[in-house]
Amino acid sequence: MEIRVPVQPSWLRRASAPLPGFSTPGRLFDQRFGEGLLEAELASLCPAAIAPYYLRAPSVALPTAQVPTDPGYFSVLLDVKHFSPEEISVKVVGDHVEVHARHEERPDEHGFIAREFHRRYRLPPGVDPAAVTSALSPEGVLSIQATPASAQASLPSPPAAK
């Protein structure tokens, strides 16, 4: 079963129940989609004995995806500032959320660049795949969230139309 999840601006998104523990996320590294070389990458070309003070820890240098680790909740924050909403696809396939973004070659300050990435996240047990939502902030942060199936059942249903 495959469910497409629309990517919408965050101001258009409905308010959802707050996710407990959202301030203590897990981290995924290597989220720099073609942004050039870091000091640590350049420093590997010269011996560390010559200039050890030029090195910076990779965990400080790299932007991260944030994945809170609370059981029963699902939330991911991805930096996708180099992609437009039309270039980003979010869909639910089985018990996974798949994110794909791609743009064709375009000019930048260093010449030309094309970017593409795929990310796949497993939904925790008890999360309703149909409840997955995504929103894109003006700063280029993609937020993907889902609530537990039990939380969906406890929400009041909208009044019936007459």
Curated annotation (Swiss-Prot):
Small heat shock protein which functions as a molecular chaperone probably maintaining denatured proteins in a folding-competent state. Seems to have versatile functions in various biological processes. Plays a role in regulating muscle function such as smooth muscle vasorelaxation and cardiac myocyte contractility. May regulate myocardial angiogenesis implicating KDR. Overexpression mediates cardioprotection and angiogenesis after induced damage. Stabilizes monomeric YWHAZ thereby supporting YWHAZ chaperone-like activity. The modification Deamidated glutamine is found at residue 66. Homodimer. Small heat shock proteins form high molecular mass oligomers containing variable number of monomers; these oligomers display a very flexible quaternary structure easily exchanging their subunits. Heterooligomer with HSPB1; formed through oligomerization of HSPB1:HSBP6 dimers; subunit exchange leads to formation of at least two different heterooligomeric complexes, differing in variable quantities of HSPB1 and HSPB6 homodimers in addition to HSPB1:HSPB6 heterodimers. Residues 1-72 are annotated as: Involved in stabilization of the HSPB1:HSBP6 heterodimer. The keyword Magnesium does not apply. Belongs to the small heat shock protein (HSP20) family. Widely expressed. High expression in muscle tissues. One of its GO terms (cellular component) is cytoplasm. Signal peptide: none annotated. CDD domains: ACD_HspB4-5-6 (cd06478). One of its GO terms (biological process) is chaperone-mediated protein folding. Keywords: Chaperone, Cytoplasm, Isopeptide bond, Nucleus, Phosphoprotein, Secreted, Stress response. It is found in: Cytoplasm; Nucleus; Secreted. Pfam families: Crystallin, HSP20. This is Heat shock protein beta-6. There is a cross-link at residue 162 (Isoglutamyl lysine isopeptide (Lys-Gln) (interchain with Q-31)). GO terms for molecular function: protein folding chaperone; protein homodimerization activity; protein kinase binding; protein-folding chaperone binding; structural constituent of eye lens; unfolded protein binding. Residues 56-162 form the sHSP domain.
